[in-house]
Amino acid sequence: MLEIFSKKRRQKGFTLIELLVVIAIIGILATIVLVSLNTARQKARDVRRLSDIRQLALALEMYYDDTNYYVKNISTCPSISTNLGVLVPTYMGALPSDPGSNDYYYGSDANGQDYVLRAILENAVPAGSYTSGTATYGCVCVAASKEYCIRP
């Protein structure tokens, strides 16, 4: 009978510390994955914004080819829905909308010979976009503020 008590019993299973370490590692990995996923989503929305602005620019160029002027502004750098509705359906199927909570903006000179399209990005503005420290047709385009603008 003493032999039964004196032998070490081999325990099956994991200790509490081992379980806590594994749970902590899983938590850290999950956090890293979620942060990476959020960054990827932001970049995807920005790519969509850049594409939408380029599509608007193409539609404006087709409009210019037909009329010899770009769509003239009604007010200072309004949302595209204010005065670019004339592009639908002849030059594009529908006006694009920002995938987030912002909007796209359009400003033009009084004669319709120049314009600026503006979108607000979530990440840094790509190289080659138009930037100015002052308002261009009412649209302020500052790269530090993540404002992406293009002109013809």
Regions found by a protein language model. Give the residues of each.
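Short, surface-exposed interaction loops/tails
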Residues: 111-152
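Juxtamembrane membrane-water interface segments immediately C-terminal to a transmembrane helix
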Residues: 43, 47-54
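Extracellular/periplasmic head regions of type IV pilus-like filament subunits
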Residues: 58-123
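C-terminal juxtamembrane segment of a hydrophobic transmembrane alpha-helix
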Residues: 26-45, 64
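Residues within membrane-spanning alpha-helices of integral membrane proteins
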Residues: 24-25, 52
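N-terminal leader/signal peptides at the extreme start of proteins
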Residues: 1-14
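N-terminal export/targeting and maturation segments
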Residues: 8-9, 50, 61, 66
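N-terminal signal-anchor/signal peptide hydrophobic helix marking the start
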Residues: 14-24
